Amino acid sequence: MTVTAAMVKDLREKTGAGMMDCKKALAETNGDMEAAIDWLRAKGIAKADKKSGRTAAEGLIGIASAGNKAVVVEINSETDFVARNDAFQDLVRGIANVALGTDGTVEAVSQATYPATGKSVEDSVKDAIATIGENMTLRRAAALKVEDGVVATYIHNAAGDGIGKLGVLVALKSTGNKEALNAIGRQVAMHVAATNPLAVRPSEIDPAVAERERNVFIEQSRASGKPDNIIEKMVDGRMRKFFEEVALLSQAFVMNPDQTVEAAIKEAEKTVGAPIEVAGIARLLLGEGVQKEESDFAAEVAAAAKG
């Protein structure tokens, strides 16, 4: 396969690697972008997370909650100017509230009735396009619910009540005090905003993702020239560290890095008055997956927590 300049540019943007390294990586992997990223990582040239968390699409994230259930939606617009428009912001809040009555899938939310117009959300968005004069779309949605407990929420870079650039839901099961439960839930939600864990527990991480990491670690370890039995131990150690870093409960708590999230939740059980189980998390970053200048969310959220 011919390696084009556009492919090299794309790989450079995703990895931060040099032009010649990117060109060689694409040549070695027959133009497969994901394989080229792994090739660069195996050579120690690119970081695993460089390609993720980039944003370009404008618009807003909206959140609506009702105690034991909450939803988060992403509505995209073409420009940030429209995202600051009162009519657009009201639309995002309205769609989030409608989403509360659905299972949280884009399909269900799109077909639900939007009270302000009596039409479906999908048709109401089309009407808004004609009125505001800019294309917009319901891109993503998620919902979490617990029978007994709370779904805590957090909006980062808030543009108003319930709307912003990053939204997080954290579902906590517990029979304890709901106010205290929501307090620790909000802290965990802020942590999720900062660290973007892949799953709550190591056992819940996608096996395909874990296998991909293992393969990269194997290739990196082989470069050491050590015997296979030593390489296996090295890889096992790096995989343990990988799981600790990407699973929520084993991560160092942003609010207090001296303890894990799991330890912080265990400590909160004293105030809540009952055991707490993290039943699920959801995190939507505006325009996630599309190129734009990156932000240090860990630093931003930590600063917001202290302020």
UniProtKB/Swiss-Prot annotation:
Record-level Gene Ontology MF annotations: translation elongation factor activity
Keyword set, alphabetical order: Cytoplasm, Elongation factor, Protein biosynthesis
SUPFAM superfamilies for the chain: Elongation factor Ts (EF-Ts), dimerisation domain (SSF54713), UBA-like (SSF46934)
Keyword Cytoplasm included in the entry's annotation: yes
A cellular-component GO term for this protein: cytoplasm
Pfam families: EF_TS
Function: Associates with the EF-Tu.GDP complex and induces the exchange of GDP to GTP. It remains bound to the aminoacyl-tRNA.EF-Tu.GTP complex up to the GTP hydrolysis stage on the ribosome.
Cross-referenced HAMAP family: EF_Ts
Stated family: Belongs to the EF-Ts family.
Protein's name according to its UniProt entry: Elongation factor Ts
UniProt organism field: Sinorhizobium fredii (strain NBRC 101917 / NGR234)
